[in-house]
Each structure stands twice: as C-alpha cells, then as structure tokens.
C-alpha cells in the first residue's frame, strides 16, 4: 500500500475518533506541532526509524518529549511506531487537516502581501475569497513578500489569485513577448 493511502487510512481513523470525542481542533493543533517537529528535527526521525532502538524506547522518547499530547494522538503515534510507520506523521497531518476542513466547510489560504495585513483586512479577504472559492469560510495566514511591489497574491489549495503589481508586470511582459513573434 502506498504511503499516501496509508496516511489517509490513519488520518481517517484518527478523524473519526476526533469527531466522537469532539476534539477536532485540539487534535489538529497537536498534529500540526508534531508535523513541524518531525520535519525540522532530523534526529528524531532518525531515532524513530533506527532498527536497533526498541519500540519501547521510541515510545518512551515520544512520551517524554510530547507528554502533553491527547491520548488519541499519543496512541496513534505509538501504533505508528509499532508498525514502523512513524515517517508518515507529516502526511497523516495533512490528510487530517483536509478532513477537518471538509467537515467545517473551510479551507486554508495564504495571503502574500508587501506589508503585514490587519485583522480587519484579513477578515474582509476571507469573506471575499470564500465566496469565490464556494466555501463557508477561509482560515487565512499572512506572509510578507516584499518582491510583490504592491497588491496581494492569494493561494487557496492549488489555486492562485494574483493581484500583485509584480504579477501584472509579468503578465504584461508575456503578452508583449508573445505579440512580437
């Protein structure tokens, strides 16, 4: 079974538990933190995948490092350790977030701007682009990109709405280059 299929199965099972226990948001937050740690700490993944380190030692390491995790997440990580699949935690997290967003009828979006946006600006953008995307709401994260010159660029899933000055200049350049042929 492919890694993504396995991640989907574990994410789906964990999501079912999250729904039953009304802990979707809490589990999503915990998984997001775990994902960052797994991605940024190569040593952790090395230890968890090392064949000479016993499963009990690996679980003890997780328990000591992430003792504040909910029982559901902790048991899922332990199960992944037992089945030698701890490397799928980042993919499992992504799949869990997709399921949670579907249940909430929301999506995550990144708004790139030249300067940080205010809460009011982000709320307004959330409402406008939620309508465009045909969903109930957007959870917006703002990233500053000074190379945009002005305007904004919004990424929702794999869709990009580019209203930046640099994007407009690039489109004009392509049109002019295409017209000279």
Swiss-Prot record:
Membrane topology: Peripheral membrane protein
Single GO cellular component term: proton-transporting ATP synthase complex
Keyword Membrane carried by entry: yes
Subcellular localization(s) per the UniProt record: Cell membrane
PROSITE patterns: ATPASE_DELTA (PS00389)
Keywords per UniProt: ATP synthesis, Cell membrane, CF(1), Hydrogen ion transport, Ion transport, Membrane, Transport
Gene3D superfamilies in UniProt: N-terminal domain of the delta subunit of the F1F0-ATP synthase
GO MF annotation terms: proton-transporting ATP synthase activity, rotational mechanism
Protein's job: F(1)F(0) ATP synthase produces ATP from ADP in the presence of a proton or sodium gradient. F-type ATPases consist of two structural domains, F(1) containing the extramembraneous catalytic core and F(0) containing the membrane proton channel, linked together by a central stalk and a peripheral stalk. During catalysis, ATP synthesis in the catalytic domain of F(1) is coupled via a rotary mechanism of the central stalk subunits to proton translocation. This protein is part of the stalk that links CF(0) to CF(1). It either transmits conformational changes from CF(0) to CF(1) or is implicated in proton conduction.
HAMAP family registered for this protein in UniProt: ATP_synth_delta_bact
Quaternary structure and interacting proteins, as annotated: F-type ATPases have 2 components, F(1) - the catalytic core - and F(0) - the membrane proton channel. F(1) has five subunits: alpha(3), beta(3), gamma(1), delta(1), epsilon(1). F(0) has three main subunits: a(1), b(2) and c(10-14). The alpha and beta chains form an alternating ring which encloses part of the gamma chain. F(1) is attached to F(0) by a central stalk formed by the gamma and epsilon chains, while a peripheral stalk is formed by the delta and b chains.
Family listed: Belongs to the ATPase delta chain family.
Name recorded for this polypeptide: ATP synthase subunit delta
Protein's organism: Bacillus velezensis (strain DSM 23117 / BGSC 10A6 / LMG 26770 / FZB42)
């Amino acid at each position: 079974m492919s890694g993504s299929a396995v991640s989907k199965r574990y994410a789906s099972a964990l999501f079912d538990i999250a729904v039953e226990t009304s802990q979707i948001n809490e589990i999503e937050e915990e998984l997001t933190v775990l994902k960052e740690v797994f991605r940024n700490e190569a040593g952790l993944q090395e230890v968890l995948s090392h064949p000479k380190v016993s499963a009990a030692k690996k679980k003890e390491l997780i328990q000591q490092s992430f003792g504040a995790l909910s029982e559901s997440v902790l048991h899922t990580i332990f199960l992944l350790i037992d089945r030698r699949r701890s490397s799928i935690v980042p993919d499992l997290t992504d799949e869990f977030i997709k399921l949670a967003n579907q249940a909430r009828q929301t999506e995550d979006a990144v708004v790139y701007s030249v300067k940080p946006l205010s809460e009011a600006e982000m709320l307004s953008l959330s409402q406008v682009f939620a309508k465009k995307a045909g969903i109930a709401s957007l959870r917006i994260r703002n990233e500053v990109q000074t190379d945009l010159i002005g305007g904004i660029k919004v990424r929702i899933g794999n869709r990009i709405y580019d209203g930046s000055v640099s994007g407009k200049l690039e489109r004009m350049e392509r049109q002019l280059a295409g017209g000279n042929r």
